[in-house]
């Protein structure tokens, strides 16, 4: 039976560029959607730009243009980036749309009629110069706990403390610099606490389609923390309103009050799908009515679970709609084992990747090869990226077609032999359902491992039968025809298995194979006596220079923007990188050990996560013999060289500095002590 499925990715915010972190999610979603379509299911993939809120309003003001003009331009840029990575949306829309306004207001009215909305007077900080109430992130000041300067109004990035903006010491507006005033305002709240019983049942429940949980195990555990145990709940009611001036939709019957962006953003899924339905004739209500038998899945980042697994299902249910079938969260992307960094050039934008001429399907494959169904961070190791793409895609996969196609064209007029009884092909077809199950369950890493294992079997068959030698031997034409036909059929099957991940390659391969399209059926049937076209090279190798140029391009793109940020820091500028010969120029700083742990595979190294005050870094130090229990160093202050050139530590990662230690008479290395009162970032000397 054909399944009817609606799938979404989280909506990118309309005030920044798309980077590879965004691509993790959209590639994960796109692979799943393409697999469903290959299987013959009726599956729609909808997304949109998330366009409302204070940041968008202020960014447009800064550019001197209307918010509507800015978000239209940003949407074009976002869609171009996603399209460049072969993300196949059925509709990419905007939350600033008539459909979204209507749905947002309808849901609000339904919740209000269901006694799930109430108004309260609250106190907020107000910018007297800009005449606007300030969101938490637009208030800065001194942390009330650690007294770090220039911290946001909701949490301290130095000590991690959370607080309300009214608790900041010497607060100021990040918009104008003015001292904010505390004023009262009427706000509207969604009574989320009253939805706890429904949410406890939904979050721990299973979907009726296949009995699988609505949430991943890790997400369910987090929900239990937020929902509380038994009849008690820790859920707070949710402020869904903001005061003018605000770029968004005005709340019905409440002049000057606007829906908070997180109310209308998920409603954007409905709006995008409704826009698609109206264009191509789909029954929208069949997908969103209460009790719908269709499926609806949301792919999101782990940082927005709260909104998608609590607010959104409750909003839908108590406004008379269906709740999601499943909410699937993924982890964050690191590059070479570290958080993406603009200064290191590893904050890689999608646009820069495409402009540097790198094949988007290289990155699609690499990311998919790291993804599974768990909420785990994944790492883009640039050297591994080069070697894996070259080995798997070029060496193992496309090379099969390259090695066999020439003989078929030259010796057999481009026509294949019927090899439906091939033992080799039987091995490939036998894995069809197992690989399909991996894709279905979002176990892409396992699927690709299994596919490459099949490619290994095919390449072993090539080496064992040596078609280039058969071509030289008299009387071996029939055998040559058979072997090369098996290889072309094997290539077709592998292409079908890889098609969700490599859609453009599959399209190009279909032209070579003289097929209208590649479908999942091609994993189970042979081509028979079929004529193919002349082979054209399907994929180039990744070159080291391409990756080096990509990193350099991203460094250069942020150089101008980074300079002002460095000048605004309260800390002295870190000196230029120094070698050992320039030791006297070395810039030493106090750093706090956030975490210290042994390095797997090394008996000498310890890995330090350090807070320098102005930024966090990872440094490896060869002092493991002196500190058999590295956790005892957590919280300690150390002295580190802040401008020592980063070094790649074999397979362990990049060390961004050097920790100073003293060598004892016994040959032990001991960390230098720092007197009480010294703070992370203080200069030593």
UniProtKB/Swiss-Prot annotation:
Pfam families: Anticodon_3, tRNA-synt_1g, tRNA_bind
Keywords: Aminoacyl-tRNA synthetase, ATP-binding, Cytoplasm, Ligase, Metal-binding, Nucleotide-binding, Protein biosynthesis, RNA-binding, tRNA-binding, Zinc
List of residues binding ATP: 342
GO BP terms in the entry: methionyl-tRNA aminoacylation
Keyword match Metal-binding: yes
Main location: cytoplasm
EC number(s) from the headed UniProt entry: 6.1.1.10
Domain tRNA-binding: 582-685
Enzyme's top EC category: ligase
The record's free-text note on cofactor binding: Binds 1 zinc ion per subunit.
HAMAP family in UniProt: Met_tRNA_synth_type1
Similarity section: Belongs to the class-I aminoacyl-tRNA synthetase family. MetG type 1 subfamily.
Protein name as it appears in the record: Methionine--tRNA ligase
């Amino acid at each position: 039976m054909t399944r009817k499925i609606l799938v979404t990715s989280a909506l990118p915010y309309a005030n920044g560029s798309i980077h590879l972190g965004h691509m993790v999610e959209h590639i994960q979603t796109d692979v799943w959607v393409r697999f469903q379509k290959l299987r013959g299911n009726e599956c729609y993939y909808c997304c949109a730009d998330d366009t409302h809120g204070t940041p968008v309003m202020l960014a447009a003001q800064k550019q001197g243009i209307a918010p509507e003009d800015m978000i239209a331009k940003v949407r074009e840029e976002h869609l171009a980036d996603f399209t460049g990575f072969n993300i196949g949306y059925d509709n990419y829309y905007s939350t600033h749309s008539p459909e979204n306004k209507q749905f947002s207001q309808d849901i609000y009215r339904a919740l209000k009629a269901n006694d799930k909305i109430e108004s309260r007077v609250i106190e907020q900080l107000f910018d007297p110069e800009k005449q606007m109430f300030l969101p938490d992130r637009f208030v800065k000041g001194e942390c009330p706990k650690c007294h770090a300067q220039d911290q946001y109004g909701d949490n301290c990035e130095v000590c991690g403390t959370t607080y309300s903006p009214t608790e900041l010491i010497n607060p100021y507006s990040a918009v104008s610099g003015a001292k904010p005033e505390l004023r009262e305002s009427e706000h509207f709240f969604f009574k989320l606490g009253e939805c706890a019983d429904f949410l406890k049942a939904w979050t721990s429940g299973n979907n009726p389609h296949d009995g699988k949980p609505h949430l991943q195990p890790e997400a369910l555990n987090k929900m239990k923390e937020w929902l509380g145990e038994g009849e008690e709940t820790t859920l707070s009611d949710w402020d869904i309103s903001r005061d003018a001036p605000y770029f968004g939709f005005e709340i019905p019957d409440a002049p000057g009050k606007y829906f908070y962006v997180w109310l209308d953003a998920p409603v954007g899924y409905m709006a995008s799908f409704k826009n698609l339905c109206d264009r191509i004739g789909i029954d929208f209500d069949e997908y969103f009515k209460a009790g719908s038998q269709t499926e609806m899945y949301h792919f999101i980042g782990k940082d927005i679970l709260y909104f998608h697994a609590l607010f959104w299902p409750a909003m839908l249910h108590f406004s008379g709609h269906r709740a999601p079938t499943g909410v699937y969260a993924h982890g964050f992307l690191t590059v070479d084992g570290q958080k993406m960094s603009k200064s290191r050039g590893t904050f890689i934008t999608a646009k820069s990747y495409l402009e540097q001429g790198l094949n988007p399907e290289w990155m699609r494959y690499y990311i998919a090869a790291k993804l599974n169904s768990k909420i785990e961070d994944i790492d883009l190791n640039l050297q591994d990226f080069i070697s894996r793409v070259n080995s798997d895609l070029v060496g193992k996969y496309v090379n099969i077609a390259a090695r066999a196609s020439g003989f078929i064209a030259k010796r057999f007029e481009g026509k294949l032999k019927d090899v439906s009884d091939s033992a080799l092909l039987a091995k490939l077809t036998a894995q069809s359902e197992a690989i399909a199950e991996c894709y279905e369950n979002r176990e892409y890493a396992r699927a690709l491992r299994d596919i490459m294992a099949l490619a290994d079997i095919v390449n072993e068959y090539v080496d064992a039968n040596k078609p280039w030698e058969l071509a030289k031997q008299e009387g071996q034409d029939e055998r040559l025809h058979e072997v090369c036909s098996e290889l072309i059929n094997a290539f077709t099957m592998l292409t079908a298995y890889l098609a969700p991940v490599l859609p453009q390659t599959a399209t190009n391969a279909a032209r070579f194979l003289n097929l209208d399209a590649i479908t999942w059926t091609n994993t189970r049937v042979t081509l028979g006596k079929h004529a193919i076209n002349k082979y054209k090279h399907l994929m180039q190798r990744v070159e080291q220079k391409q990756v080096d140029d990509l990193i350099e391009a991203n460094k250069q793109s942020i150089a101008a923007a980074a300079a002002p940020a460095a000048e605004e820091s309260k800390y002295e500028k870190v000196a230029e990188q120094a070698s050992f010969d320039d030791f006297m120029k070395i810039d030493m700083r106090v750093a706090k050990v956030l975490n210290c742990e042994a390095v797997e595979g090394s008996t000498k190294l310890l890995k330090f996560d350090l807070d320098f005050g102005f930024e966090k870094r990872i440094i490896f130090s060869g002092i493991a013999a002196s500190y058999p229990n590295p956790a005892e160093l957590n919280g300690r202050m150390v002295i580190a060289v802040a401008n020592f050139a980063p070094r790649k530590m074999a397979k362990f990662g990049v060390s961004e500095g050097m920790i100073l230690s003293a060598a004892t008479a016994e040959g032990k290395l001991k960390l230098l002590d720092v007197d009480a009162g010294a703070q992370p970032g203080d200069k030593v000397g």
